[in-house]
Design a protein with these regions (language model features):
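S-adenosylmethionine
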Residues: 1-388
Length: 388
């Protein structure tokens, strides 16, 4: 949008000019609590405090956009205009259009622009003798509501609670004492798809900050072992702090490079989880900066993902289960990569996913594509494979 109205392209603008213009344009087009003149005036004042010389430029661009606001908002949803309307790099919109069709692309981008909901995960490890999860959930909901939190239980997963008006969670007693954790509903699906048996040996190769590992530990009722790995020491500390807060004793965090084969892990685990580094194109509403990723950076990811998956395959016992997951909707990081992996590794086969609230025909394929426009949650890909 800014590029259309400015002779100086965004990439060449001073960083502060770019940020102020983006904020101003968003307010002009999509917010209505402040009149246009007020938005422009505040943007110019802000710019003067940083760089007085650029204030006239900011004023001119924003006034130009304000004058043409109605025609801009009336842009049709042809894919050529979607990059402007939703503020994406052109190549991202083109790729979504190629993979999901031009008509659906607008719906996907709109869904990725909706304010994300907040979900809490209940710690099953807090169940007392004779108590079921419904009892624990009621106890937590009652305490949340007494604290002024709005609770919306949509019954997607029994251990999940949707909340509003929940601020400074780290200071809440329920959080500090390990009853709840913040985790998006799509992310919770990974441990659910794994569905580990009690006393199993589990490896989480890309575990930080620890949400999925701890969810797995909770599902096994603090039995067995979950080895949660990451390549950075500061992330290992995050995992340890997470599991300690929840009171889990079956989580062990250690440094390990998922890109390098670890001979000590070969054939040692009942379950392995690969929640690999990805483009994040399913969680744009949580991390809007993803809209501006460079094509070459995203195109380099499948090679990294495949290397991690190949190593993970070697760590599983016979009849063990391998979970591959991402938080992207790009097919080259998801099903296309899995198809290539299965072609090269005949000892693995897709296995029907249980324990998830989706139509049977979607789960029987052995992989689940969660797309924001259809499923009303963050975009995710989860694949379950068995070693035969």
């Amino acid at each position: 949008m800014i590029n259309k109205k400015s002779k100086i392209k965004v990439k060449k603008m001073n960083h502060s000019v770019k940020i102020i213009l983006r904020m101003g344009v968003y307010q002009l087009l999509y917010l209505d609590r402040v009149a246009d003149y007020g938005v422009i005036d505040e943007a110019v004042k802000m710019m003067k405090k940083i760089d007085r010389r650029s204030s006239g430029f900011v004023n001119a661009i924003l006034r130009n956009i304000s004058r043409e606001k109605d025609s801009i908002l009336d842009l049709d949803d042809s894919y050529k205009n979607l990059a402007i309307k939703y503020s994406y790099e052109d190549w991202i919109v083109d790729r979504i259009s190629d993979q999901y069709g031009k008509e659906r692309t607008s719906n996907i981008l709109a869904a990725l622009s909706i304010r994300p909901r907040i979900f809490l995960r209940i710690n099953r490890n807090k169940l007392r003798d004779g108590e079921n999860l419904s009892d624990l959930k009621k106890y937590i909901v009652d305490r949340l509501e007494k604290d002024g939190v709005i609770v919306r239980d949509r019954h997607i997963l029994e251990e999940a609670i949707e909340v509003e008006n929940f601020k400074q969670i780290e200071n809440k007693d329920l959080f500090k004492s390990g009853y709840i954790s913040v985790q998006d509903i799509s992310s919770m699906m990974v441990a659910r798809a794994l569905n580990p048996k009690k006393n199993s040996k589990v490896l989480d190769l890309c575990a930080a900050p620890g949400g999925k590992s701890c969810h797995i530990g909770e599902m096994m009722k603090d039995s067995g072992s979950v080895l949660a790995c990451d390549v950075f020491d500061h992330k290992i500390k995050l995992i340890k702090a997470y599991s300690n807060r929840l009171g889990l004793t079956n989580i062990e965090a250690c440094i390990n490079n998922a890109m390098v084969l670890n001979e000590d892990y070969v054939g040692a685990f009942d379950y392995v989880v690969c929640d690999v580094p990805c483009s994040g194109m399913g969680i744009v509403r949580r991390k809007p900066e993803i809209k501006y990723k460079k094509k070459e950076d995203v195109d380099s990811l499948p090679k990294i993902q495949r290397k991690i998956l190949d190593n993970a395959a070697k760590y599983i016992k016979k009849d063990g289960v391998l979970i591959y997951s991402t938080c992207t909707i790009f097919k080259e990081e998801n099903i296309e990569l899995i198809e290539e992996f299965l072609k090269d590794n005949k000892e693995f086969k897709l296995e029907s996913i249980e324990n998830l609230p989706f139509e049977r025909e979607r789960l029987d394929k052995g992989y689940l594509e969660i797309i924001p426009d259809r499923d009303d949650m963050d975009g995710f890909f989860i694949c379950r494979m068995k070693k035969i």
